[in-house]
Every structure is written in structure tokens, then in C-alpha cells.
Regions:
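Non-catalytic accessory regions of SAM-dependent methyltransferases
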Residues: 1-48
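Non-catalytic substrate-recognition/targeting regions of SAM-dependent transferases
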Residues: 32-45, 61-127, 135
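Conserved class I S-adenosyl-L-methionine
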Residues: 143-150
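Conserved SAM-binding loop of SAM-dependent methyltransferases across substrates and taxa
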Residues: 153-166
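Conserved SAM-binding motif I beta-strand of class I
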Residues: 167-172
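S-adenosyl-L-methionine
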Residues: 176-214
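Mobile active-site "lid"/loop adjacent to the S-adenosyl-L-methionine
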Residues: 177, 213-243
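C-terminal catalytic and target-recognition region of SAM-dependent MTase-like enzymes
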Residues: 239, 253-315
């Protein structure tokens, strides 16, 4: 009976994604979003002809062959890549080395091209959850000097360059994702300066040099999975945001994000208020958002609304 319910839920979610009309904007979107879609322990992302499956539970892993068959039926001719993080396998007591590696896919999002490579980037290969936020921010960058902090594979920075920013700099500590980011800039025939650095000393140096930007993006990786570590995570967010605010010119735009599900939106906004106070800056909040409609969350599971996005004007 449980398997029948899972199969019915899975089929319903695939149909619902069609109703959302996601293909009009992008060929990269989330097909199944774990408990938000009633399929806890399963995440599926579609990147053009490549479908990436991530298992978070032994139960979903046991049904993997049915899951693969259902995806191939819905996306004829697709390639399937599946994996599970080591910590999940240890926690859930199953062993999975993953399917055969697949070549990266080239996806298009609002006219901007990216390489989605599950073997060479964090998570399933591309952060489709930021699609709407990238598009919104890119409407405000023409002729502007843009700084993309914790840039990963260059999503916000490449968008900004495509949309006419005068200068774009991306900073990340991970050289592997920066190599993908440079490839993404090349795919779109735009110039972005990517720097491999820890953002803390980099921002302190920028402040010492009086270096300021019209638009600053701060999108760090998840801080913690442990409820006991939420307060230390908020302290790190505070330190990061305080430094990043110092790089925004007066009247500039600041976009800050948290993908730590255990950090609530009210906690994140309070952290941002304190960061503004300590940085001596006034923050005018323009927009508070999250992930796109292909990343639904359940009202009774608030931590499943993991992505917080805040866009501010800074004085």
C-alpha cells in the first residue's frame, strides 16, 4: 500500500510540474522535492536530457529501479544519474556507489546557458532553486559593478554579465567550482573575473582598499544540519553579512541568502538587522523570497522551506 501511495504521489508530482509551465523559462528544474512533494527522502532534478536522482533514505533507495523507470517514461531518452551522500548512507544503513557517471548537460535558464555537472559541483550539479532570484536580480544590474560572493558555479555573476553589468567579480574558496564558473562565462561569451579566495580576508582587503560595488550577492553553502549548531551558524552569517555590507556602495543593492533549513526566516532577518547595525549601514528591505515553485514546502514542516532570500537597498 505504501509503494502504491508513493507511485501515485510521484505520478501526480510529474503532472503538476507540467502545470507550472517550467519549460517556458528553463530546461533545468526540480522534478521531486522530497517531503515537499510527499516523497520524503527523494530529490530529483532535471537538467535538459540529464535527470539526477539523490537518495536521502533507505526506503527510497529500495525503490530506485521503479523511480528510474518512471523518470524514463516521463522524460523519453533521458540519461539518469543517481547518488547518495556518504553521511546519508551511514545514517540510513545502505551502501550505494552511485550509477555510472554521466557527461555534463548544457541547460538554458531565461536565455542564460550553464553547465550542469553532478560530478563536479555541490549538490546535484546546479542550483535551480535560485532561478527566480537570479532573474529578479539581473533586472537591476545593467551598467553596474557587481560582486558575487560564494559564487559557486557563477550563477548570479554570469547572469549579471549577460544582462549588461559593466564589471563582474565572483569569489569562491573552491577551485573546482570556479573552473565550472569560468566555463559558464565562456558559454555565454561574457567576461567575469573569478577569484579563488576565502571571502573573509578578501572582503577585509577590499574594505582596506576602499573597494565598493553597486550590487553585492552573498550566497554561502549550508552552514549546519545540526539543531545544536544553529546559534554558531547565525554568528557566522552575521560576520559574513557585516563584512559584505561594507563592500556595498551607498545606494547599492545587497542580495543575501541562506540555504540552511534549520535557520528560520525571522532569525535570518534579525541577523541581517544586527549586521546592518554593526556595519553602520541602513538596510531598506525590498523583497523577501525563497526557492521557486518547483521547490514546494509543507506548512507543517517549516524547515523544508530552506532557502531564504533577502534583497536590500543599502545606505
Amino acid at each position: 500500500a505504501l509503494l502504491r501511495r508513493h507511485r501515485a504521489a510521484g505520478s501526480a508530482r510529474l503532472v503538476w510540474r507540467d502545470v507550472l509551465g517550467l519549460d517556458a523559462d528553463s530546461d533545468a528544474w526540480r522534478v521531486v522535492h522530497s517531503e515537499g512533494d510527499g516523497l520524503s527522502g527523494l530529490v530529483v532534478d532535471r537538467y535538459a536530457d540529464l535527470v539526477v536522482v539523490e537518495f536521502f533514505s533507505a526506503g527510497m533507495f529500495r525503490h530506485r529501479e521503479w523511480i528510474y523507470d518512471a523518470l524514463r517514461a516521463h522524460f523519453p531518452g533521458c540519461r539518469v544519474h543517481a547518488f547518495a551522500d556518504e553521511h546519508v548512507q551511514k545514517q540510513e544503513s545502505f551502501d550505494f556507489r552511485g550509477t555510472e557517471p554521466q557527461a555534463p548537460a548544457i541547460i538554458t535558464e531565461h536565455g542564460v546557458k550553464f553547465r550542469a555537472d553532478p560530478a563536479g559541483a555541490h549538490k546535484t550539479g546546479f542550483f535551480a532553486d535560485q532561478r527566480d532570484n537570479r532573474q529578479w536580480l539581473s533586472r537591476h544590474v545593467q551598467g553596474k559593478r557587481v560582486l558575487d560572493l560564494c559564487c559557486n558555479t557563477g550563477g548570479f555573476g554570469v547572469y549579471a554579465a549577460v544582462r549588461g553589468a559593466s564589471e563582474v567579480t565572483g569569489v569562491d574558496i573552491d577551485q573546482d567550482v570556479l573552473d565550472i564558473a569560468r566555463g559558464n562565462a565562456k558559454l555565454n561569451d561574457v567576461r567575469v573575473r573569478f577569484v579563488q579566495a576565502d571571502i573573509f580576508p578578501w572582503l577585509r582587503d577590499a574594505a582596506a582598499n576602499g573597494d565598493a560595488y553597486d550590487v553585492v550577492v552573498l550566497d554561502p553553502a549550508k552552514m549546519t544540519r545540526d539543531r545544536e549548531q544553529v546559534i554558531p551558524a547565525l554568528k557566522k552569517y552575521l560576520d559574513m553579512n557585516k563584512l559584505a555590507l561594507g563592500a556595498v556602495r551607498p545606494g547599492g543593492l545587497f542580495a543575501t541568502f541562506s540555504c540552511t533549513g534549520l535557520v528560520r526566516e525571522d532569525q535570518f532577518l534579525d541577523m541581517l538587522r544586527r549586521a546592518g547595525y554593526y556595519a553602520g549601514r541602513t538596510l531598506q528591505v525590498l523583497k523577501v523570497a525563497g526557492a521557486g515553485a518547483d521547490h514546494p514546502f509543507l506548512a507543517n514542516v517549516p524547515e523544508s522551506r530552506y532557502l531564504k532570500a533577502v534583497f536590500c537597498r543599502v545606505e
